[in-house]
Amino acid sequence: MTVYTASVTAPVNIATLKYWGKRDTKLNLPTNSSISVTLSQDDLRTLTSAATAPEFERDTLWLNGEPHSIDNERTQNCLRDLRQLRKEMESKDASLPTLSQWKLHIVSENNFPTAAGLASSAAGFAALVSAIAKLYQLPQSTSEISRIARKGSGSACRSLFGGYVAWEMGKAEDGHDSMAVQIADSSDWPQMKACVLVVSDIKKDVSSTQGMQLTVATSELFKERIEHVVPKRFEVMRKAIVEKDFATFAKETMMDSNSFHATCLDSFPPIFYMNDTSKRIISWCHTINQFYGETIVAYTFDAGPNAVLYYLAENESKLFAFIYKLFGSVPGWDKKFTTEQLEAFNHQFESSNFTARELDLELQKDVARVILTQVGSGPQETNESLIDAKTGLPKE
């Protein structure tokens, strides 16, 4: 049996200008454009291997070691579009193997909790679509492939690029102009770093799909957001990224996170994605910025309680004097800093005259893990396969 395979890793992206609301639920067309930062795959990634052979009996998906349904409409839409593009290639070149007619085996693994507010669906669909596109050797551009990923999970289209990415909402009813484009590569502003504070890795009560449609249907504040707030902020944030203006980027990121969660609260019944710990982290960030007299850290929260803190490498010692004091006892610090660096963080805190009350030491018991990462690249083809090339089945 000849088995054709391809494997790809894809990154998590965290929106700094949030996507929330669909104007077309089948095509995943958004009510507003959005912007995100792609995070390094050294720390957060999905690895997906795709295989095909004429002997395969049915399309099959394994996710994190378990068989998983592949029949849902979103996945089927992606597979159909990818097969159609491959079929068009085969019709023009009779020498090509007819991969589009064969069934697929797809094996995928995350190195972070699924459905925990860490954009796992974005990385997952970006990896799935990219792996099959590589398997089929499709010639389309990354932006064109991002349109297919969008049908799986809206924010997945942004994980097709590294660096700083815009998902342009488009205007066409068929969605052909709703796709991801890169604002800047990770190498253009490599100093951007991120610290994820995992408050909870439990699956959220209200899914993003359910939540955003409730907001669209019931929130008056949402209408103001998509018509006035987001279009203006989109241009300001894009300019800040191009000009590497962290102060503006940080302010707009925090304000947009607040705006997004305000529309969730304005939905009826209201949606609570953040919890008390999330709110205390927000207050803590503002306290740190006020302490230094400049904006050195920005927070953002997706549809969940976990915080993503953005900061520049040049301010790492200032920020981590406090972060390490608070969260140094929770998992996630391995091999990220030397013993000397950690001791320096402690020394800087001790000399800061910052009080325990201002620091909110109680926060340390409410954060389960820290993930220390930075801006990173888009999907990468890899030789690390999850599929046995002889059998076409997941490796044991």
Curated annotation (Swiss-Prot):
Q: Which reaction does it catalyse?
A: (R)-5-diphosphomevalonate + ATP = isopentenyl diphosphate + ADP + phosphate + CO2
Tell me the leader sequence span: none
**UniProt KW Nucleotide-binding keyword:** yes
Pathway entry: Isoprenoid biosynthesis; isopentenyl diphosphate biosynthesis via mevalonate pathway; isopentenyl diphosphate from (R)-mevalonate: step 3/3
**GO CC terms:** cytoplasm; cytosol; vacuole
Sorted UniProt keywords: ATP-binding, Lipid biosynthesis, Lipid metabolism, Lyase, Nucleotide-binding, Steroid biosynthesis, Steroid metabolism, Sterol biosynthesis, Sterol metabolism
Fetch the Gene3D superfamilies from UniProt. 3.30.230.10, GHMP kinase, C-terminal domain
- Give the family per the record: Belongs to the diphosphomevalonate decarboxylase family.
Protein name per its UniProtKB record: Diphosphomevalonate decarboxylase
Q: Which organism is it from?
A: Saccharomyces cerevisiae (strain ATCC 204508 / S288c)
Instruction: Print the organism lineage.
Output: Eukaryota, Fungi, Dikarya, Ascomycota, Saccharomycotina
